[in-house]
């Protein structure tokens, strides 16, 4: 006897892309005007933090990314949480024993802003192996909000993706794949402190350029594509080329090398071994091993 399951995954209602908004130059200019407000000023490892080092931030970032993947969060939750983390660390000296607590609170805040069903404090405590209590997260949530002046609607690189892709006019059968690859680049950039002080528009533009060239999604040469992308966001061509070739693609090669040497470490599961939210309509970004250089 054969069994046939016709039950589909329940999807949350979503509005489709609005061509008028995507094509309105005022939307893009508004984001470009606001983005500098949310970029850390200078390296906080040199002038603010005494105990925390860059490799500690990277370890925390990988853990936060794994939690987001396990919970099938929206693609922009993780980079937004890293933006909160960098902005807090750029102005408040923090002990290394408090770093995971800070990262957990940043995940909580980002999910509240960008998720339909945000992560719960209890679930986040499970992911820390009960290393922190719910009351600590609640206290630090208020603390982080105060230090960020309650300004949580930060402009991040993800906000530019749809606007830039709309202006590229790529073949319709390649747009989704290019976007997915670009999202992977953005997640990778968020784990690397090198990109913390880059304008989000430059990171988004460089990520799309790397994705388009890697997939061969258009007939333009590398120089022509770079000039077109630079014109869309008003970025200098040389700066964009350096960001794409010397930083983003180099970071990807390093990540691929690390992935080949070490197996991914599992994160603690929610009760029952799976997300209590059930299947989600959002998917995690394409794995770095699926990227074509």
UniProtKB/Swiss-Prot annotation:
Alphabetical keyword list: Cell cycle, Cell division, Cyclin, Cytoplasm, Nucleus, Phosphoprotein, Transcription, Transcription regulation, Ubl conjugation
Where do Low complexity bias regions lie?
271-286
Q: Which Gene3D superfamilies match?
A: Cyclin-like
Q: Where is this region: Disordered?
A: 257-293
Query: Which SMART domains does the record associate with it?
Result: CYCLIN (SM00385), Cyclin_C (SM01332)
Q: What broad class describes the main subcellular location of this protein?
A: nucleus
Where in or outside the cell it occurs: the entry states:
Nucleus; Cytoplasm
GO cellular component terms? Answer: cyclin D3-CDK4 complex; cyclin D3-CDK6 complex; cyclin-dependent protein kinase holoenzyme complex; cytoplasm; microtubule organizing center; nucleus
Q: Does the keyword Acetylation apply?
A: no
* Free-text description of this protein's post-translational modifications in UniProt: Phosphorylation at Thr-284 by MAP kinases is required for ubiquitination and degradation by the DCX(AMBRA1) complex.
Record-annotated Cyclin N-terminal domain positions: 27-152
Instruction: Cite a single GO BP annotation.
Output: positive regulation of cell population proliferation
Q: Hydrolase: is it a keyword of this entry?
A: no
Annotated positions of the Phosphoserine modification: 265, 280
Q: Where along the sequence do coiled-coil regions lie?
A: none
Q: Which residues are recorded with the post-translational modification Phosphothreonine?
A: 284
Q: Which GO terms describe its molecular function?
A: cyclin-dependent protein serine/threonine kinase activator activity; cyclin-dependent protein serine/threonine kinase activity; cyclin-dependent protein serine/threonine kinase regulator activity; protein kinase binding; protein serine/threonine kinase activator activity
What the protein does comes down to:
Regulatory component of the cyclin D3-CDK4 (DC) complex that phosphorylates and inhibits members of the retinoblastoma (RB) protein family including RB1 and regulates the cell-cycle during G(1)/S transition. Phosphorylation of RB1 allows dissociation of the transcription factor E2F from the RB/E2F complex and the subsequent transcription of E2F target genes which are responsible for the progression through the G(1) phase. Hypophosphorylates RB1 in early G(1) phase. Cyclin D-CDK4 complexes are major integrators of various mitogenenic and antimitogenic signals.
The family this protein is said to belong to: Belongs to the cyclin family. Cyclin D subfamily.
Enumerate the PANTHER family for this protein. CYCLINS
Its subunit composition reads:
Interacts with the CDK4 and CDK6 protein kinases to form a serine/threonine kinase holoenzyme complex. The cyclin subunit imparts substrate specificity to the complex. Interacts with ATF5. Interacts with EIF3K. Component of the ternary complex cyclin D/CDK4/CDKN1B required for nuclear translocation and modulation of CDK4-mediated kinase activity. Can form similar complexes with either CDKN1A or CDKN2A.
- This chain belongs to the protein called G1/S-specific cyclin-D3
Please name the source species: Rattus norvegicus
């Amino acid at each position: 006897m054969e069994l046939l399951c016709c039950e589909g995954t329940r999807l949350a209602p979503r509005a489709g892309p609005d061509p008028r908004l995507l094509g309105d130059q005022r939307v893009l200019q508004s984001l470009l005007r606001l983005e500098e407000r949310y970029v850390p000023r200078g390296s906080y490892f040199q002038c603010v933090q005494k105990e925390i080092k860059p490799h500690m931030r990277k370890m925390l970032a990988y853990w936060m990314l794994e939690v987001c993947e396990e919970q099938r969060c929206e693609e922009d939750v993780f980079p937004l949480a890293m933006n909160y983390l960098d902005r807090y660390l750029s102005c408040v000296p923090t002990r290394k024993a408090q770093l995971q607590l800070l990262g957990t609170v940043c995940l909580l805040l980002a999910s509240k802003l960008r998720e339909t069903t945000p992560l719960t404090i209890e679930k986040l405590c499970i992911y820390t192996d009960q290393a922190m209590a719910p009351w600590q997260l609640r206290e630090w949530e208020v603390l982080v909000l105060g230090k960020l002046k309650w300004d949580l609607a930060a402009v991040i690189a993800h906000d530019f993706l749809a606007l830039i892709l709309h202006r590229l006019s790529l073949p319709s059968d390649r747009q989704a794949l290019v976007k997915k690859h670009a999202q992977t680049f953005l997640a990778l950039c968020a784990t690397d402190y090198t990109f913390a002080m880059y304008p989000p528009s430059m990171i988004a533009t460089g990520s799309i350029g790397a994705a388009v060239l890697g997939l061969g999604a258009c007939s333009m040469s590398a120089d022509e594509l770079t000039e077109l992308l630079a014109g869309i966001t008003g970025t200098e061509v040389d700066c964009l080329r350096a960001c794409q070739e010397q930083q983003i693609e180099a970071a990807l090669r390093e990540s691929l090398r690390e992935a080949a040497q070490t197996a991914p470490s599992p994160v603690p599961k929610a009760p029952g071994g799976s997300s209590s939210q059930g299947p989600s309509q959002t998917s995690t970004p394409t794995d770095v091993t699926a990227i074509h250089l």
